[in-house]
Amino acid sequence: MIKYIVKKLLLLIPVLIGITFLSFAMMRLAGGDAVTYMYENAGAAVSQEVIDDTRKEYGLDQPFLVQYAKWFTGMATGDMGMSYVSKRDVYDTFIEKLPATILLTLSSVLLTMLISIPLGILSAVKHNRLIDYLIRFFSFIGNSMPNFFAALVLMYFLSIRLGWFPVITTDNKALSLVLPTLTLAISMASKYTRQVRATILEELNKDYVKGARARGVRGSVIIWKNVMKSSMLTIITLLALSIGSLLGGTTIVETIFMWDGVGKMAVDAITMRDYPIIQAYVAWMAIIYVVVNLITDIIYHYLDPRVRLGGDQA
């Protein structure tokens, strides 16, 4: 166990180097000058000499590889640099935005599971009946709907027409959280309902279920004590995928609802060419996916000892 965890964490180093190097290179290849844009955005007319001095101050006059090496060394020691726009420490900025993203992640995942697991089970149990067709139909509609479209529809009906919730984030965090949570849950619950249904159907056709039915065991007992236990690995995989992607920040949803999380922070940084913020966001995405996958593997191992850490079957 310890050996496997150490191996996975060591794997994070080349992953971080590869991903951050590529993003570093792509930002430079995208063209434009961060310093020039910074002054233009501030509405300040400055001379070329001031621009050159600022570039030197930020180390942007140095060769690409030198810039990257300095940034990566700083990140490894906890120094992510300073934002070009806000002039604040990148680490402090990131920590400030992270709680909002964590809150949105937890609420969205919780609502998704509360919707998708019962509906997936109901659809499987009522296989090829009216309720099954209805659940599959609405799951298809929800899965086909882009997040931005769902956000605009919810915003129009629940905010503009009915006035139940604020259009964008306000000081009332509880009310402001509802629409972005619903937006994310619609898409995820639609997709996961279909996957839960497929998993439950597969389990219901296995011999141990048929044997339990033949012995007169009630259907609800079979579902909750036997089938659900065997389906937990699939559900955990869904949770891991959701948490990993959401903790990276749901850029579109956070931007539409002005939810002040790391996703919106990344969009603002890209717009402003705030390289240190962008690089910190990319590094965070890489770290969170490796860590979430590691935790998922460990949970797999404890739920089903036949699964060896490393992915092999015992």
Region roles according to the model:
Residues L60-I117:
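An internal, D/E-rich "acidic patch" concept
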Residues K87, R136-A198, T271:
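Membrane-water interface segments at transmembrane-helix boundaries in multipass membrane proteins
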Residues I2-K7, L11, P118-L154, L233:
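Cytoplasmic-entry segments and transmembrane alpha-helices of multi-pass inner-membrane transporters
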Residues I2-K3, F94, L98-I131, T170-A314:
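Alpha-helical transmembrane segments of integral membrane proteins
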Residues A30, G142-M145, L247:
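Transmembrane helix irregularities
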Residues F21, L106-L110, F149-L154, A283:
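Hydrophobic alpha-helical transmembrane segments of multi-pass integral membrane proteins
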